[in-house]
């Protein structure tokens, strides 16, 4: 998108191309994970590596740094009288819409059901393969939109842009209450987790720490939360098992 805009192409065309690339990537991820049953983390990281290689080839390793100011203003302009940028307002509205879809529509609830127990969801008539496939497409489209806004906000795109963001995204989701095993959490919680992670980064800069600390702190937060989540799941399973044993004892 950045190279097309810098080359004078129509913005709408550039946006459409960016979204279509997201759809294609989502289809690839959905095919690999939902249909071929490949491990989601390994497969998506592999696709990420391929895309970074293709980006390097497409740009010939050069930075995209002559992005027009008018495009950068998209993420900088704010509503008159308030200090809220259109960038923030758009993200907030999109978060609320997706949250409402996932919690108040049948298809949205299917996503959580498949994440919680794919086999159980299949027994009640939900197609887990189709649900996962579509979910990967939607996630990739959201990532495309985020990439376009990142380009507008930063004003420069390098071959290393976005490196490490996947770990930050995972940490934000887990911090917001998303379970790595699926079926638990909400979009609102993930958004709050993202705000907290961003606040930590800004706080480090404000305190005079180098940005090199970001990855270490993000990794530490992720490890702590995952360990706590695992302990809570183990305790929950043990409690459920204990209740079942008590019920059987009473029946006997």
Task: Write out the residue ranges for each language-model feature.
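Membrane-interface helix caps of multi-pass small-molecule transporters
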Residues: 4, 23, 27-35, 54, ...
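Helix-loop interface residues and adjacent transmembrane-helix termini in multi-pass membrane transporters
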Residues: 8-9, 35-37, 104, 130, ...
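Helix-loop-helix "hairpin" substructures at the membrane interface of multi-pass membrane proteins
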Residues: 10-18, 24-29, 33, 80-158
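Alpha-helical transmembrane segments of multi-pass membrane proteins, especially transporters
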Residues: 14-22, 40-48, 132-140, 160-169, ...
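Hydrophobic core segments of alpha-helical transmembrane domains in multi-pass membrane transport
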Residues: 19, 48, 52-53, 88-100, ...
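Transmembrane helix-bundle core of multi-pass membrane transporters
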Residues: 36, 40-104, 131-134, 153-162, ...
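Cytosolic-side transmembrane-helix boundaries in multi-pass membrane proteins
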Residues: 119, 123-130, 204-252
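Transmembrane alpha-helical segments in multi-pass inner-membrane proteins
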Residues: 143, 153-219
């Amino acid at each position: 998108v950045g190279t097309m805009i810098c080359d004078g192409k129509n913005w709408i065309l550039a946006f459409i191309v960016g979204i279509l690339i997201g759809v294609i990537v989502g289809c690839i991820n959905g095919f690999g994970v939902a249909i071929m049953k490949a491990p989601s983390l390994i497969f998506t990281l592999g696709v990420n590596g391929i895309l970074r290689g293709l980006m390097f080839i497409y740009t010939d390793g050069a930075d995209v740094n002559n992005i027009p100011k008018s495009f950068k203003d998209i993420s900088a302009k704010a509503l008159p009288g308030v200090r809220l940028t259109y960038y923030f307002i758009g993200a907030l509205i999109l978060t609320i819409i997706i949250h409402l879809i996932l919690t108040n529509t049948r298809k949205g609830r299917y996503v959580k059901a498949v994440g919680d127990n794919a086999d159980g969801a299949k027994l009640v008539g939900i197609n887990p393969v189709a649900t996962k496939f579509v979910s990967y497409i939607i996630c990739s489209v959201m990532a495309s939109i985020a990439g376009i806004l990142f380009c507008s906000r930063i004003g420069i795109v390098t071959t290393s842009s976005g490196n490490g963001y996947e770990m930050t995204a995972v940490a934000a989701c887990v911090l917001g209450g998303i379970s790595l095993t699926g079926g638990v959490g909400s979009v609102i919680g993930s958004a709050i987790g993202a705000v907290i992670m961003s606040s930590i980064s800004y706080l480090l800069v404000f305190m005079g720490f180098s940005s090199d600390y970001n990855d270490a702190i993000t990794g530490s937060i992720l490890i702590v939360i995952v360990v706590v989540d695992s302990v809570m799941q183990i305790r929950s399973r043990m409690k459920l098992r204990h209740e079942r044993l008590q019920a059987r004892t009473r029946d006997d």
